[in-house]
């Protein structure tokens, strides 16, 4: 009986198979992903974020194709990695390079259309201003305007829901109601700003402050060409200057004259930001000095951490040393503590007035070094702290490499009468240098862009004098870029910072390639 029922169930065309359920669920999920991301793409594009809209479109299209087609089944396992690489590496890189060729800054953030709209919204007071009061009556709110000895008021209206945009003023003797405090006016400021009041003689006034209504007019009028603006107060004619990204007044011959008018807008300026790095002495000189210091800092950090790490790795693996496990744990602690905590602790220890290091030096030798004021001492302090943070990692790596070297080699060298120097130069170093090379290159690249270290310890200080942009003696290129982008004297200059970031990328890439090239030559 059960077999007959099973046969009938298998032959029933209305029965839903598990494979059909999985297919339906898959296409339902893919459809939902496509709809949500498609809607997000449209929103971003409509708001002018073309780059982010294109990124979302590419990632979504790839996901739908890879997970929806049987031909690309194997690619499903590598798609998360590819998407992450596009999202966190390629896109930021391309976006930064793109910004380097624009004037994008704190003063130039809008599009031309948006900047024009902001200017069109500006107004100026073209007539007398009048004090007002907001009354609350049983029928609603009323505005009272005082024109000399004359008192005029509006009809009752509502400030919630359907707020009127035009109200007539009539001469009255008084109002039965309570005067609203200033906090109520502040709360309804948006609604009150949209109301036009009309005097009996035809004069129109609008809210010009928390206590005043005045006759105001648009400051600019847009001409028929869709770009030219006329200043209704001064009569000046303005046009967008596409070379600097600002509206500027023009003379009768159409040449730009006078001061630029904010807000600015984003325009393409070609290689101007890169040219500033080499032509502006206020940027060129600190850039070259900071680049040299960055290379020295990275190289010395790698050398110091490797030397200390290798020596300590050899010591803690010395069989005659008792308590080696305890020493290993203690020496690894600097690596276990989060770097930002250690940096802030060292910042307190090196404090020139209250730091424990200066207290000890002053008590023993009568010295009180100016760690944060003297350029040489500041660089020394940075190297000391960075070496402290980096040697445990090198020590751990060297411990593993030393374990991999056969003891027979050292026994044979001992029979030949070799000392520890010959053992290190002829056995240890040659066998460790090949696996160490990628680590040393990675350590160099990391310290080349060690922003956290500089920002938390010295913030780039002490500052250099006579530079166009903020720059310090301990600044690395990456922290110098950050200061230009967010602490610039002339405002946040994201375009120039992006140009320097692009140069940093090219420099680090070139140095890494040179290191790899020299490594291959030395191995050959």
UniProtKB/Swiss-Prot annotation:
A Pfam family found in this protein is MalF_P2
Q: Alphabetically, which GO biological process terms does the record hold?
A: maltodextrin transmembrane transport
Q: Which GO terms describe its cellular component?
A: maltose transport complex
Report the residue ranges that make up the ABC transmembrane type-1 domain in this protein.
291-515
Query: Which residues span the membrane?
Result: 23-45, 50-69, 82-104, 290-312, 325-347, 380-402, 436-458, 494-516
Topological domains, Periplasmic = 46-49, 105-289, 348-379, 459-493
Name the SUPFAM superfamilies on file: MalF N-terminal region-like, MetI-like
Q: Which domain of life is it from?
A: Bacteria
Q: Enumerate the InterPro entries for this protein.
A: MalF_N, MalF_N_TM, MalF_P2, MalF_P2_sf, MetI-like, MetI-like_sf
Q: CDD domains, from UniProt?
A: TM_PBP2
The Swiss-Prot or TrEMBL record describes its family as follows: Belongs to the binding-protein-dependent transport system permease family. MalFG subfamily.
Give the quaternary structure. The complex is composed of two ATP-binding proteins (MalK), two transmembrane proteins (MalG and MalF) and a solute-binding protein (MalE).
Q: This chain belongs to which protein, by name?
A: Maltose/maltodextrin transport system permease protein MalF
Gene symbol here is malF
């Amino acid at each position: 009986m059960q077999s007959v029922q099973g046969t009938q169930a298998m032959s029933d065309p209305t029965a839903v198979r598990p494979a059909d359920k999985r297919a339906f669920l898959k296409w339902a999920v893919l459809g939902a992903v496509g709809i949500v991301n498609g809607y997000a793409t449209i929103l971003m594009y409509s708001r002018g974020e073309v780059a982010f809209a294109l990124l979302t479109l590419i990632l979504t299209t790839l996901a739908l194709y890879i997970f929806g087609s049987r031909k690309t089944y194997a690619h499903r396992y590598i798609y998360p990695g590819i998407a992450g690489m596009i999202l966190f590496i390629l896109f930021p890189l391309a976006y930064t390079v793109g910004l380097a060729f624009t004037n994008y800054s704190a003063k130039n953030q809008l599009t031309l259309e948006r900047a024009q709209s902001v200017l069109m919204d500006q107004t100026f007071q073209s007539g007398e201003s009048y004090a007002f009061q907001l009354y609350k009556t049983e029928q609603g709110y009323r505005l009272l305007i005082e024109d000399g000895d004359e008192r005029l008021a509006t009809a009752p209206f509502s400030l919630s829901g359907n707020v009127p945009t035009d109200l007539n003023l009539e001469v009255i003797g008084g109002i039965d109601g309570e005067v609203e405090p200033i906090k109520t006016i502040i709360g309804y400021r948006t609604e009150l700003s949209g109301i036009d009041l009309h005097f009996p003689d035809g004069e129109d006034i609008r809210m010009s402050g928390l206590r005043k209504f005045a006759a105001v007019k648009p400051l600019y009028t847009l001409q028929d060409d869709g770009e030219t603006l006329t200043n209704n107060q001064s009569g000046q004619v303005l046009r967008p200057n596409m070379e600097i990204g600002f509206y500027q007044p023009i003379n009768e011959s159409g040449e730009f004259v006078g001061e630029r008018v904010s807000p600015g807008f984003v325009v393409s300026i070609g290689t101007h930001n890169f040219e500033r790095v080499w032509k502006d002495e206020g940027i060129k000189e600190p850039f070259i000095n900071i680049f040299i210091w960055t290379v020295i800092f990275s190289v010395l950090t790698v050398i110091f951490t490797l030397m200390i790490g290798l020596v300590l790795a050899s010591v803690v693996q010395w069989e005659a040393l008792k308590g080696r496990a305890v020493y290993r744990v203690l020496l690894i602690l600097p690596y276990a503590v989060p770097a930002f905590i250690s940096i802030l602790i060292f910042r307190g220890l090196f404090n020139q007035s209250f730091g424990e290091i200066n207290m000890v030096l002053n008590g023993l030798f009568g010295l009180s070094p100016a760690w944060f004021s003297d350029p040489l001492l500041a660089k020394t302090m940075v190297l000391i702290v960075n070496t402290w943070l980096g040697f445990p990692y090198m020590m751990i790596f060297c411990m593993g490499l030393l374990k991999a070297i056969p003891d027979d080699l050292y026994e044979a060298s001992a029979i030949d009468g070799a000392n520890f120097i010959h053992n290190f130069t002829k056995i240890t170093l040659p066998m460790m240098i090949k696996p160490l090379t990628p680590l040393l290159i990675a350590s160099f690249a990391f310290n080349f862009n060690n922003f956290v270290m500089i920002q938390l310890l010295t913030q780039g200080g002490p500052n250099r004098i006579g530079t166009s942009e903020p720059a310090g003696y301990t600044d690395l290129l990456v922290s110098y870029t950050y200061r230009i982008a967010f602490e610039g004297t002339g405002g946040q200059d994201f375009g120039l910072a992006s140009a320097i970031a692009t140069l940093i990328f090219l420099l680090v890439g070139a140095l890494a390639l040179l290191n790899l090239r020299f490594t291959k030559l030395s191995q050959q």
